[in-house]
């Protein structure tokens, strides 16, 4: 990384600073070291200003802190020989600051944003896989982790802090990444974590109930997602026209690519479009015949379910909009791999088919069950729970959906966190018409084991809620546990 100094970094906002060299940029006083730039933001959980003395004691070269008001914006002070710069609206400016610090990494790769309630992980993975098959060196950032394909490192949040995002992108560019697919959460948009990124394209998958414990209601949740197109450098816009919100947004995005598998496209009204003409589901996945403003074709997909057809079409439309040839995309489509913990199928002779999925919202659970039904000759089982310390309103909704779409429902723990597990289960049962027919088993490993052992060989067992996760949060403890590993062990296969 080239040399960085305080004067050049803050030149757009503040004059008269020393050209003091900066080693690294951090929001965390615990890792701040000699020569670093410490940014003391007022966060949602902590106030970085409280840790300025600690950062100074650890030898930081400079500090940027939230200004109290416009009058103090750009003010420069000194504490124990360390320059302290005051900036107003620091959280809003942080992405731009970090972008300058890390030499604008989003301008040095082809970066695609994917937002929506469901489908972000699968769509980003498909984009990264497909682009790499076409010669790019591709990376992903999101729920599963960050990194080059095959070298992904797990992360805590879908979208990291504004500094983390720019830092990771810079690291990926340094490793040779030429293409990146990034999940962008509603939290990340509202908290300005991707505000200064230059996206080559931005994809909207769908919108359904989630995160209302944070946003309050669906209107605010939608407004958060819309920020990607209204206030960010979004590049090409690719929008799911099968989603009600997506159809509304298309009216405000005349240059967007409309994507549909349900016929919600009028080629005379949309300049660029892609739609499924016919989809055949089978035990290996699906055969998809499509038409588009770029041409038509047929794809053999190894992914399960209608919503994954939608995810694949969104990825295809994005790559077409970015200029990748349709002929090359069709040649490589059959080599796309299913995504870890996203409708991931485990099979063994004489055993039920087990599907592990991350579905943890009402809409995602319904779609996962509908997808599993397409591949089920016997009974459809559903093993699921709901996370503690999160939106309680979705629990009875998910209970009702499981009861409607599955033949046998097993309600268990998800990540109970600091809530009483039985209280969460009772919230789920409250949404069911006949809760007496539901099997309740609080230990998740026991519930999964019981379901797989009791299911017949022509049954399908959907284990929903945790997907790729290899832990369970009980109280404040993070315990080792994986639905994937549990299912694979019981079937005698490798996860």
From Swiss-Prot:
Primary residence: cytoplasm
Q: Top enzyme class of this protein?
A: ligase
Q: Which residues carry this modification: N6-carboxylysine?
A: 225
Give its E.C. classification number.
6.3.2.13
**Amino-acid positions noted as binding UDP-N-acetyl-alpha-D-muramoyl-L-alanyl-D-glutamate in the UniProt annotation, renumbered to this chain:** 27, 29, 44-46, 157-159, 185, 191, 193
Tell me the Gene Ontology biological-process terms attached to this UniProt entry: cell division; cell wall organization; peptidoglycan biosynthetic process; regulation of cell shape
Please give the catalytic activity noted in the UniProt record.
UDP-N-acetyl-alpha-D-muramoyl-L-alanyl-D-glutamate + meso-2,6-diaminopimelate + ATP = UDP-N-acetyl-alpha-D-muramoyl-L-alanyl-gamma-D-glutamyl-meso-2,6-diaminopimelate + ADP + phosphate + H(+)
The answer, when asked if Flavoprotein is one of the entry's keywords, is no
Any idea what this protein is called? Answer: UDP-N-acetylmuramoyl-L-alanyl-D-glutamate--2,6-diaminopimelate ligase
Q: Which organism is it from?
A: Salmonella paratyphi A (strain ATCC 9150 / SARB42)
